[in-house]
Protein backbone atom coordinates (compact mmCIF):
# COMPACT_ATOMS: atom_id res chain seq x y z
CA UNK A 1 0.00 0.00 0.00
CA UNK A 2 1.42 3.38 -1.01
CA UNK A 3 1.49 6.20 1.52
CA UNK A 4 -0.61 9.28 0.90
CA UNK A 5 1.98 11.98 1.68
CA UNK A 6 5.64 12.72 1.04
CA UNK A 7 8.13 14.79 3.00
CA UNK A 8 8.29 18.20 1.26
CA UNK A 9 12.02 18.38 1.95
CA UNK A 10 13.40 14.98 0.93
CA UNK A 11 10.48 13.17 -0.70
CA UNK A 12 10.27 10.28 1.78
CA UNK A 13 6.81 8.62 1.63
CA UNK A 14 4.81 9.38 4.80
CA UNK A 15 1.51 8.46 6.38
CA UNK A 16 1.02 12.03 7.56
CA UNK A 17 1.40 15.55 6.19
CA UNK A 18 4.59 17.38 7.11
CA UNK A 19 8.31 16.77 7.47
CA UNK A 20 9.77 13.31 8.06
CA UNK A 21 11.55 12.83 11.39
CA UNK A 22 15.01 13.24 9.82
CA UNK A 23 14.18 16.55 8.18
CA UNK A 24 12.34 17.72 11.30
CA UNK A 25 15.44 17.03 13.40
CA UNK A 26 17.63 18.85 10.89
CA UNK A 27 15.28 21.83 10.94
CA UNK A 28 15.42 21.98 14.74
CA UNK A 29 19.21 21.56 14.70
CA UNK A 30 19.74 24.46 12.32
CA UNK A 31 17.39 26.65 14.35
CA UNK A 32 19.29 25.89 17.57
CA UNK A 33 22.69 26.40 15.96
CA UNK A 34 21.54 29.86 14.87
CA UNK A 35 20.70 31.03 18.41
CA UNK A 36 22.15 34.45 19.18
CA UNK A 37 24.10 34.95 22.46
CA UNK A 38 21.15 36.69 24.09
CA UNK A 39 18.88 33.77 23.18
CA UNK A 40 21.29 31.35 24.81
CA UNK A 41 21.35 33.46 27.98
CA UNK A 42 17.55 33.59 28.07
CA UNK A 43 17.26 29.82 27.71
CA UNK A 44 19.85 29.31 30.44
CA UNK A 45 17.89 31.67 32.70
CA UNK A 46 14.63 29.85 32.03
CA UNK A 47 16.27 26.50 32.76
CA UNK A 48 17.54 27.81 36.10
CA UNK A 49 14.10 29.10 37.04
CA UNK A 50 12.33 25.88 36.01
CA UNK A 51 14.92 23.19 36.73
CA UNK A 52 12.35 20.68 38.01
CA UNK A 53 10.67 20.69 34.59
CA UNK A 54 13.91 19.28 33.19
CA UNK A 55 13.68 16.29 35.53
CA UNK A 56 10.03 15.87 34.52
CA UNK A 57 11.01 15.91 30.81
CA UNK A 58 8.82 18.94 30.17
CA UNK A 59 9.40 21.19 27.16
CA UNK A 60 10.74 23.71 26.42
CA UNK A 61 13.20 23.09 29.28
CA UNK A 62 13.95 19.50 28.29
CA UNK A 63 14.61 20.32 24.61
CA UNK A 64 16.50 23.50 25.55
CA UNK A 65 18.80 21.56 27.88
CA UNK A 66 19.90 19.11 25.21
CA UNK A 67 20.36 21.83 22.62
CA UNK A 68 22.33 24.03 25.02
CA UNK A 69 24.55 21.09 25.89
CA UNK A 70 24.86 19.48 22.47
CA UNK A 71 25.12 22.48 20.17
CA UNK A 72 26.58 25.20 22.38
CA UNK A 73 28.31 23.45 25.31
CA UNK A 74 26.46 26.01 27.43
CA UNK A 75 25.50 24.24 30.68
CA UNK A 76 26.96 26.62 33.24
CA UNK A 77 28.10 25.99 36.84
CA UNK A 78 25.12 28.08 37.96
CA UNK A 79 22.74 25.65 36.25
CA UNK A 80 24.58 22.74 37.85
CA UNK A 81 24.40 24.30 41.32
CA UNK A 82 20.67 24.95 40.98
CA UNK A 83 20.12 21.36 39.83
CA UNK A 84 22.05 20.03 42.83
CA UNK A 85 20.11 22.22 45.27
CA UNK A 86 16.83 20.99 43.77
CA UNK A 87 18.05 17.37 43.87
CA UNK A 88 17.65 17.02 40.13
CA UNK A 89 19.88 14.05 39.32
CA UNK A 90 18.57 13.23 35.87
CA UNK A 91 19.63 13.60 33.14
CA UNK A 92 23.09 12.96 34.54
CA UNK A 93 24.70 14.90 31.68
CA UNK A 94 23.80 18.12 33.46
CA UNK A 95 26.79 17.52 35.74
CA UNK A 96 29.37 17.06 32.99
CA UNK A 97 32.66 18.52 34.29
CA UNK A 98 30.83 20.32 37.13
CA UNK A 99 32.97 22.41 39.53
CA UNK A 100 34.41 21.02 42.78
CA UNK A 101 31.65 22.33 45.06
CA UNK A 102 28.99 20.60 42.94
CA UNK A 103 31.08 17.42 42.90
CA UNK A 104 31.32 17.48 46.70
CA UNK A 105 27.55 17.89 46.91
CA UNK A 106 27.05 14.87 44.67
CA UNK A 107 29.44 12.81 46.77
CA UNK A 108 27.62 13.79 49.97
CA UNK A 109 24.27 12.83 48.45
CA UNK A 110 25.67 9.52 47.19
CA UNK A 111 27.21 8.56 50.53
CA UNK A 112 23.92 9.43 52.22
CA UNK A 113 21.79 7.41 49.79
CA UNK A 114 19.67 4.59 51.20
CA UNK A 115 18.20 3.11 48.04
CA UNK A 116 19.81 1.62 44.96
CA UNK A 117 17.76 3.76 42.56
CA UNK A 118 19.06 6.99 44.08
CA UNK A 119 22.61 5.63 44.25
CA UNK A 120 22.43 4.60 40.60
CA UNK A 121 21.44 8.10 39.48
CA UNK A 122 24.06 9.76 41.68
CA UNK A 123 26.89 7.50 40.48
CA UNK A 124 25.90 8.38 36.91
CA UNK A 125 26.08 12.08 37.81
CA UNK A 126 29.44 11.65 39.50
CA UNK A 127 30.73 9.78 36.45
CA UNK A 128 29.78 12.78 34.31
CA UNK A 129 31.63 15.11 36.69
CA UNK A 130 34.59 12.79 36.27
CA UNK A 131 37.54 14.27 38.19
CA UNK A 132 40.00 12.39 40.42
CA UNK A 133 37.94 12.78 43.59
CA UNK A 134 34.90 11.44 41.76
CA UNK A 135 36.96 8.42 40.74
CA UNK A 136 38.26 7.93 44.29
CA UNK A 137 34.69 7.87 45.57
CA UNK A 138 33.52 5.29 43.04
CA UNK A 139 36.65 3.21 43.65
CA UNK A 140 36.02 3.21 47.41
CA UNK A 141 32.39 2.20 46.90
CA UNK A 142 33.57 -0.66 44.72
CA UNK A 143 35.98 -1.88 47.37
CA UNK A 144 33.59 -1.32 50.28
CA UNK A 145 30.03 -1.68 48.94
CA UNK A 146 27.08 -0.06 50.66
CA UNK A 147 23.90 -2.09 51.35
CA UNK A 148 22.23 -0.62 48.24
CA UNK A 149 24.84 -2.33 46.04
CA UNK A 150 22.77 -5.54 46.26
CA UNK A 151 20.05 -3.83 44.24
CA UNK A 152 22.34 -2.97 41.31
CA UNK A 153 23.52 -5.12 38.42
CA UNK A 154 27.02 -3.68 37.97
CA UNK A 155 29.92 -2.22 39.96
CA UNK A 156 30.74 1.50 40.26
CA UNK A 157 33.46 1.10 37.61
CA UNK A 158 30.71 0.36 35.08
CA UNK A 159 28.89 3.55 36.05
CA UNK A 160 32.12 5.48 35.40
CA UNK A 161 31.85 4.41 31.76
CA UNK A 162 28.82 6.68 31.41
CA UNK A 163 31.20 9.62 31.74
CA UNK A 164 33.64 8.26 29.16
CA UNK A 165 36.15 6.68 31.53
CA UNK A 166 36.57 3.84 34.01
CA UNK A 167 39.21 2.38 36.32
CA UNK A 168 40.81 -0.96 37.14
CA UNK A 169 41.04 -2.72 40.51
CA UNK A 170 44.25 -0.87 41.31
CA UNK A 171 42.55 2.47 40.79
CA UNK A 172 44.21 3.36 37.49
CA UNK A 173 42.04 5.58 35.31
CA UNK A 174 41.21 4.31 31.82
CA UNK A 175 39.98 6.73 29.17
CA UNK A 176 37.28 5.36 26.89
CA UNK A 177 36.92 8.26 24.49
CA UNK A 178 38.43 11.47 23.18
CA UNK A 179 37.99 15.14 23.97
CA UNK A 180 37.57 16.04 20.29
CA UNK A 181 34.46 15.42 18.19
CA UNK A 182 33.75 15.91 14.49
CA UNK A 183 30.33 15.35 12.94
CA UNK A 184 29.51 13.42 9.79
CA UNK A 185 27.68 15.77 7.43
CA UNK A 186 26.08 15.41 4.02
CA UNK A 187 28.62 15.94 1.27
CA UNK A 188 28.39 16.20 -2.49
CA UNK A 189 28.68 13.40 -5.03
CA UNK A 190 32.29 12.26 -5.31
CA UNK A 191 33.50 14.44 -2.42
CA UNK A 192 36.57 12.96 -0.74
CA UNK A 193 36.61 12.39 3.01
CA UNK A 194 39.11 10.79 5.44
CA UNK A 195 36.17 8.99 7.07
CA UNK A 196 33.51 6.96 5.34
CA UNK A 197 30.85 5.09 7.30
CA UNK A 198 28.68 2.46 5.66
CA UNK A 199 30.17 3.16 2.24
CA UNK A 200 29.80 -0.41 1.02
CA UNK A 201 32.99 -0.14 -0.99
CA UNK A 202 32.94 -2.87 -3.59
CA UNK A 203 34.84 -6.02 -2.59
CA UNK A 204 35.50 -9.19 -4.53
CA UNK A 205 35.16 -11.51 -1.53
CA UNK A 206 31.81 -12.91 -0.43
CA UNK A 207 30.37 -13.93 2.91
CA UNK A 208 31.01 -17.61 3.79
CA UNK A 209 27.59 -17.83 5.45
CA UNK A 210 25.16 -16.21 2.99
CA UNK A 211 27.20 -15.67 -0.17
CA UNK A 212 26.47 -11.94 -0.19
CA UNK A 213 29.07 -9.29 -0.97
CA UNK A 214 31.34 -8.23 1.86
CA UNK A 215 31.57 -4.46 2.33
CA UNK A 216 34.05 -2.03 3.85
CA UNK A 217 31.65 -0.54 6.36
CA UNK A 218 34.19 1.92 7.80
CA UNK A 219 37.29 3.50 6.29
CA UNK A 220 39.16 5.99 8.47
CA UNK A 221 42.32 7.80 7.40
CA UNK A 222 44.11 8.88 10.57
CA UNK A 223 46.65 10.91 8.59
CA UNK A 224 44.10 13.67 8.03
CA UNK A 225 44.92 16.71 10.19
CA UNK A 226 41.45 16.67 11.77
CA UNK A 227 41.98 13.13 13.01
CA UNK A 228 45.48 13.52 14.47
CA UNK A 229 43.97 13.21 17.96
CA UNK A 230 43.32 9.51 17.25
CA UNK A 231 47.03 8.74 17.07
CA UNK A 232 46.48 6.55 14.00
CA UNK A 233 49.24 7.01 11.41
CA UNK A 234 47.52 5.20 8.58
CA UNK A 235 44.20 3.88 7.30
CA UNK A 236 41.80 1.74 9.32
CA UNK A 237 39.42 -0.40 7.28
CA UNK A 238 36.62 -2.42 8.90
CA UNK A 239 34.86 -5.06 6.81
CA UNK A 240 31.73 -7.12 7.39
CA UNK A 241 28.79 -8.80 5.73
CA UNK A 242 25.90 -6.34 6.18
CA UNK A 243 23.42 -9.21 6.14
CA UNK A 244 25.07 -11.56 8.66
CA UNK A 245 26.86 -9.17 11.02
CA UNK A 246 23.81 -9.01 13.28
CA UNK A 247 23.41 -12.79 13.36
CA UNK A 248 26.91 -13.79 14.47
CA UNK A 249 27.58 -15.65 17.70
CA UNK A 250 30.15 -13.03 18.67
CA UNK A 251 31.64 -9.79 17.30
CA UNK A 252 32.80 -9.53 13.69
CA UNK A 253 36.56 -9.29 14.22
CA UNK A 254 39.02 -7.79 11.71
CA UNK A 255 42.76 -7.20 11.66
CA UNK A 256 43.76 -4.06 9.76
CA UNK A 257 47.07 -2.83 8.40
CA UNK A 258 47.99 0.85 8.18
CA UNK A 259 48.06 0.74 4.38
CA UNK A 260 44.30 0.15 4.33
CA UNK A 261 44.41 -3.63 4.14
CA UNK A 262 42.10 -5.80 6.23
CA UNK A 263 41.86 -9.46 7.23
CA UNK A 264 38.42 -10.76 8.21
CA UNK A 265 38.53 -13.37 10.97
CA UNK A 266 36.38 -16.53 10.81
CA UNK A 267 32.94 -16.19 12.38
CA UNK A 268 30.04 -18.39 13.47
CA UNK A 269 26.30 -17.84 13.16
CA UNK A 270 24.40 -17.55 16.43
CA UNK A 271 22.40 -20.76 15.83
CA UNK A 272 25.38 -22.86 14.75
CA UNK A 273 24.17 -23.18 11.16
CA UNK A 274 26.75 -23.18 8.39
CA UNK A 275 24.65 -21.36 5.81
CA UNK A 276 21.88 -18.78 5.75
CA UNK A 277 20.12 -16.52 3.26
CA UNK A 278 21.34 -13.06 2.30
CA UNK A 279 18.76 -10.50 3.35
CA UNK A 280 20.38 -7.45 1.73
CA UNK A 281 18.82 -6.63 -1.62
CA UNK A 282 20.74 -5.27 -4.63
CA UNK A 283 19.00 -1.93 -4.02
CA UNK A 284 20.26 -1.85 -0.45
CA UNK A 285 23.80 -2.69 -1.53
CA UNK A 286 23.56 0.18 -4.01
CA UNK A 287 22.39 2.54 -1.25
CA UNK A 288 25.47 1.63 0.78
CA UNK A 289 27.76 2.67 -2.06
CA UNK A 290 25.99 6.03 -2.33
CA UNK A 291 26.28 7.10 1.29
CA UNK A 292 26.82 10.90 1.02
CA UNK A 293 28.19 11.60 4.50
CA UNK A 294 31.68 13.06 4.94
CA UNK A 295 33.71 14.32 7.90
CA UNK A 296 32.79 17.84 8.99
CA UNK A 297 35.36 20.59 8.58
CA UNK A 298 35.26 21.87 12.18
CA UNK A 299 34.93 20.19 15.60
CA UNK A 300 31.68 20.31 17.57
CA UNK A 301 30.77 19.87 21.26
CA UNK A 302 31.13 16.31 22.56
CA UNK A 303 27.38 15.89 23.06
CA UNK A 304 26.51 17.12 19.57
CA UNK A 305 24.88 13.84 18.60
CA UNK A 306 22.67 13.74 21.70
CA UNK A 307 20.81 16.98 21.04
CA UNK A 308 18.33 15.76 18.42
Task: Set out the residue ranges of the language-model regions.
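Preference for intrinsically disordered or flexible, low-complexity segments
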Residues: 3-308
Amino acid sequence: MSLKYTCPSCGTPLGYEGLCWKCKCEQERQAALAWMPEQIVEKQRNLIQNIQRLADMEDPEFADFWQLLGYHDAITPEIQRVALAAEVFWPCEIYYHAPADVRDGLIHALLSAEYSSAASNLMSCLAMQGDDKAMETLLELGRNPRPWRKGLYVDPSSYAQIGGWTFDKEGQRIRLGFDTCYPMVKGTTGEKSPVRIGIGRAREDTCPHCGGRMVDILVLDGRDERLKFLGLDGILTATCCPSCVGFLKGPAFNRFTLDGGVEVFPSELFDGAEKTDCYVSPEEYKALTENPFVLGKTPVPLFYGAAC
